[in-house]
């Protein structure tokens, strides 16, 4: 399998829906992929980044459960915060045999339904989820690989604030 990496430059200062289609070089390839990116703001905004970390925590399991397990959209289903340069975003990535337009629609439907679920969450459940995230952030790294991965992620993002984790705990 040959993976191709490419970069697309889009001005995210204006709102919009941007789709970039790529023709596969192998016409027999049944899989497609969707990288659904939501631009959130400037990653230097500590409060915004902290809130997005909570959203990421709230969405991770339901995204996999709904889109991978229940809808069986694809083998690869991931959701995550996304840091690049100064941009802060949220990504849902799905590799699927289904048409990308269909996958995109299912992602949007899921986000709308889960938005309502978060809005209707009672305060006790919200506090429980928040505590779960705080506990997760307080966990010590288990090995050198985890620590290297964390540092490397800061380097790749172009935002060299290696104290983010401690800052998150300050904003709790």
What residue ranges belong to the model's regions?
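Mature, solvent-exposed C-terminal subdomains and processed small-chain segments of exported/organellar
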Residues: 1-91, 95-172
């Amino acid at each position: 399998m040959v993976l191709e990496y490419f970069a697309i430059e889009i001005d995210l200062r204006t709102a919009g829906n941007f789709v970039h289609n790529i023709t596969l070089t192998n016409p027999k390839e049944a899989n497609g992929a969707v990288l659904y990116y939501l631009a959130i703001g400037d990653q230097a905004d500590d409060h915004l980044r902290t809130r997005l970390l909570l959203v990421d925590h709230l969405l991770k399991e339901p995204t996999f459960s709904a889109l991978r397990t229940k809808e069986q959209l694809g083998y690869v289903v991931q959701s995550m915060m996304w840091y690049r340069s100064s941009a802060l975003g949220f990504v849902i990535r799905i590799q699927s045999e289904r048409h990308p337009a269909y996958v995109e629609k299912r992602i949007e439907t899921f986000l709308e339904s889960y938005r309502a679920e978060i809005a209707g969450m009672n305060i006790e459940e919200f506090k429980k989820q928040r505590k779960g995230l705080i506990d997760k952030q307080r966990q010590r790294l288990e090995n050198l690989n985890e620590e290297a991965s964390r540092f490397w992620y800061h380097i790749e993002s172009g935002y060299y604030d290696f104290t983010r984790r401690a800052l998150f705990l300050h904003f709790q």
